[in-house]
Amino acid sequence: MAAPLQYPLCCQTVTFYHADPAAHTITRTVVQGVHFDTRRRETAAGGSGPAGSAATAFLLVIPEKHAAFGRDYTLEPHDRVFAGTGPEVSYTQWLDFTPAKVPGLAAVQYVDCKTAAGQAVHVEAGGWWTRSGSGAHSLSN
């Protein structure tokens, strides 16, 4: 039997936000024991995108042993992630609660549950956005 996966970099706290348009509510969940990595990508002259264009990207890893997906939290595209313990946000504040306006905030574009030997081991989530706050831009552009 293989040794269990270790997550030495998963020592951060994040806050998840999920909007429910039908109920006009925002669900806020604080999760500890995660790895939240942000990075900046700039396009040089001669690349496939306009020279000087930039995007910010993030990768989030949530070990199942720290928080169980679907039980302790939910996460899906269009949700938002804040580095650290984030503020309470009302539904009327949601449209202004964007990565372009709030430092430390990221917009989720994908969520992928990873398994080993048929058991969930961690969830990966990520996304990217430009200075204007728009997302879903290919990092290969």
Each predicted region: which residue ranges?
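N-terminal disorder-to-order initiation segments that are Gly/Lys/Arg-biased
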Residues: 1-66, 103, 110-141
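Short, acidic/charged, Gly/Pro-enriched secondary-structure junctions
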Residues: 70-109
